Amino acid sequence: MRTAFRRGQSIDTTTDLRRVIEGALEFIPAAERKQAVKKSCQRTFQALRIDVNSEFEVLYSFLEKLPDALADGGRAAILTFHSGEDRLVKKSFRDLHRAGVYSAVSTEVIRPSAEECARNSRAKSTKMRWAIK
C-alpha cells in the first residue's frame, strides 16, 4: 500500500489511510505494532478533523471575543480535550490576565477524578481552565 501511495494513488477511505499508516510502521516489532498503529491512526484522524473543522481558528476567535461577552466579575470555564487546545486557552488567559483584562485565571489545570474517568473514558484527556473578568 505504501508503494501505491508513493506512486500517486489517492487515499479515498479511512481504510486506505489506515493501511498507509500500517505500512509506515512495519519496522515496529509485531508485539508493539497493533498499539502503535492504533495511536498513530487516532492522532492522524484527530489532525485531519482539527484541520477540516478549522478548530484552532474557531477557538482562537472565540478566545479573542470572550472578554467582550463577559460582564465585570463574569466567569468563563473552558474544557479542552487535547494539548493543542489547552495551550491556546492557557496562553490566552495568561496574556489577558497580564494585560489586566482578567482579574484572575486558573494557575493549575483542573482534571477529572479517577471515578469520573472510570464512568466516562472520554473524560480522561479533559482539562478545565477558568478566568474571571
Report residues per predicted region.
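S-adenosyl-L-methionine-dependent methyltransferase catalytic core, i.e., the SAM/SAH-binding region
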Residues: 1-133
